[in-house]
Amino acid sequence: MIQIKRALVSVSDKTGITEICSFLTKHGVEILSTGGTYDALSKAGIAVKKVDEFTGFPEILHGRVKTLHPKIHGGLLGDTTNPDHVKQMESNGIVPITLVIVNLYPFVKTVMKPDVTLEDAIENIDIGGPSMLRSAAKNHKNVVVLTDPKDYESFQNEFTTNNGKISRETAFGYAAKVFSETASYDSAISSYFNKRLGIKYPDKITFAFNKKQKLRYGENPHQDAAFYEPLFLKSQFEALQGKELSFNNMLDFDAAFHVASLLPKNAVSIVKHLNPCGIAFGETVLESFELARKTDPISAFGGIIGIHGRVEKESAEEITKNFVEGVIAESFSNEALEIFAKKPNIRLIPIAKFDEALDELDLRSLHHGLLIQNRDYDLITKDKLKIVSKKQPTEDDLEGLMFAWNCVKFIKSNAIVYTDQNSTLGIGAGQMSRVDSVELGAMKAQKVGLSVVGSYVGSDAFFPFRDGIDAIAKVGAKAIIQPGGSIRDEEVIQAADEHGLIMVFTGMRHFRH
């Protein structure tokens, strides 16, 4: 057990600090402190000694050096179970410090300000705080260290129960928390510096995330899971109503948001198992939803709806006629919320800045490492298209082809989508053979009574053989948009010409694994 006799206190987040220090002084614990923390404790009438009085050395360099002193770090690092340590401490006038309450300068909060300067950021890099935390955490068998105000209550309870002592097991748990905190802090600084320098892929990379919540389970009930949010980006998954978000819900919400956010205003995407099962945009959100749902109403059952716009009463009424897991949109009107409230299990997530909420990096974990890439946000404009067929597209054809192209990029490879000018008709997703995706997309459209005659076909990658083109012609589609780049492009173009199809190349592939 660790007897608490002397505490070093220096905090930026002063939540609960006067309460815990008042508790400590009532139990005879000496308090040492600096700067603003000293002022706050003194103002509250708590007996506290300045660190410079304790060390006999003044604060210097405008406060940059306050606690970096042998009397502080000797008191934190000295192992009082080691006779040599005790002897050296006594000969140098160093006394043990058995409790540290420290949290760090608000670096992340500072650099998230839109007008932050490099100088502001640098002045909010804490040096003394991490040093004290690490010293105390290293010597956790003799020192208790608190860096999270949420731990103050449990500390006080154990202190009271054990007559001023804390178990080494508890101290070890606090120490582990400290090293997570200091690692996260340094990661945030590293990320900020790399961003300032324009370095996307440094030789060594760390990511700082805070645990937002423990999830009931992962992708399947036998898997554990938790949700973490990055320090520099507040989580968008704040539900207005509905059941607790599951692991799979979060994946589908993210996908539905991603699809809708990169399409025109009022666009609607319906997602199931990370695949869109309907995408559309119309004059209103209601029109878009009705068009998107027609693509595959069976798969839309229990799906997640992404809406690039505001959900009004009429849209809410139509959505709630169906079983859906949730809706993510720019906003919801009060009338819409009243309607959704009658279906309390539907999860509702608003993202006010729909166009600005996209993260740049895509991370994929492997059993033996981590893959990082920039996200596939690039869009092709009509002027970049290369018309390779003899038959030329009209302006309306180009609009339809662009819509097909902007849809297919969100579908799992091998991906084929049949569309009209503003809604999907049939989706062939995730097949190992491209021609199978061609046939699947047409079959799914026909299954729900949608005709693909005269439709536009988007393919996420090139056609390796002409069989895909023959299959598209067989169902009566009008035009094809694809990246090109196959060694058999000439054969594929010839097939399009034989069937009187329009074909355009984008020069950009959109694999999605």
From Swiss-Prot:
Signal peptide: none annotated. It holds the Pfam family AICARFT_IMPCHas. Pathway: Purine metabolism; IMP biosynthesis via de novo pathway; 5-formamido-1-(5-phospho-D-ribosyl)imidazole-4-carboxamide from 5-amino-1-(5-phospho-D-ribosyl)imidazole-4-carboxamide (10-formyl THF route): step 1/1; Purine metabolism; IMP biosynthesis via de novo pathway; IMP from 5-formamido-1-(5-phospho-D-ribosyl)imidazole-4-carboxamide: step 1/1. One of its GO terms (biological process) is 'de novo' IMP biosynthetic process. Its EC number is 2.1.2.3, 3.5.4.10. Keywords: Hydrolase, Multifunctional enzyme, Purine biosynthesis, Transferase. It comes from the Bacteria. The keyword Transferase applies. It catalyses: (6R)-10-formyltetrahydrofolate + 5-amino-1-(5-phospho-beta-D-ribosyl)imidazole-4-carboxamide = 5-formamido-1-(5-phospho-D-ribosyl)imidazole-4-carboxamide + (6S)-5,6,7,8-tetrahydrofolate; IMP + H2O = 5-formamido-1-(5-phospho-D-ribosyl)imidazole-4-carboxamide. CDD domains: IMPCH. The keyword Transferase applies. PROSITE patterns: MGS. Residues 1-147 form the MGS-like domain. One of its GO terms (cellular component) is cytosol. GO terms for molecular function: IMP cyclohydrolase activity; phosphoribosylaminoimidazolecarboxamide formyltransferase activity. The IMP cyclohydrolase activity resides in the N-terminal region. Belongs to the PurH family. This is Bifunctional purine biosynthesis protein PurH. It comes from Leptospira biflexa serovar Patoc (strain Patoc 1 / ATCC 23582 / Paris). The gene is purH.
